[in-house]
Regions:
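Hydrophobic beta-strand scaffold residues
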Residues: 47, 95-96, 124, 144
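Active-site nucleotide/adenylate-binding loops and adjacent lid/helix of ATP-dependent enzymes
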Residues: 1-4, 62-63, 105-165
Length: 165
């Protein structure tokens, strides 16, 4: 099978002086990309390392195609960034691994995800979406656990994320 491999390399994303320590948390190392490529090749597949969404757009615009895309791309900008590659692949009717674009767009927004879970009556801990620099006024029991609203792969989470009264 011809498999395209999409990913975002750490080396292609440069932090600035205001970037958090976990800036690279969701991007792949060259070692990871090589390891996954090797594993797929060992299984008998022909693997094309495509890279990020910009490379995928070029790949597709040149008329190149694969049977399946192994998608690990994180996207780059905006709160629906993880859904960018799957959306493009859906438009080209190319199957891919992992979650679809709608699921990725919803789940990156933790507040929206919690709303959907509650509407579906799926048990989930109480939550509150807070704006920056606001006092915490809540009836939710302490300690609280805070997370960035639009991040994944544990970015922005440390022992400082626990708030005691």
């Amino acid at each position: 099978m011809k498999i395209g491999f999409t990913y975002d390399l750490r080396s292609k994303h440069q932090p600035d002086e205001n970037s958090p320590a976990d800036y690279y948390g969701e991007y792949e190392s060259g070692e990871t990309v090589a390891g996954i490529t090797g594993a797929l090749t060992t299984l008998g597949h022909e693997v094309t390392q495509i890279g990020n969404i910009t490379s995928l757009v070029k790949f597709l615009s040149e008329g190149k195609r694969v049977d399946l895309v192994f998608n690990m791309a994180e996207g780059r900008y905006g709160r629906t960034r993880e859904s960018q590659v799957p959306s493009l692949l859906e438009a080209y009717q190319i199957p891919y691994t992992f979650s679809d674009s709608l699921t990725l767009a919803i789940c990156l927004d933790k507040g929206r995800t919690k709303e959907i879970l509650k509407l579906a009556q799926i048990p989930t801990p109480e939550y509150q979406v807070l704006e920056p620099e606001t006092d915490i006024e809540t009836t939710i029991a302490f300690p609280l656990f805070t997370k960035p609203l639009y991040e994944g792969t544990s970015k922005g989470i440390s022992e400082d994320a626990i708030i005691y009264r």
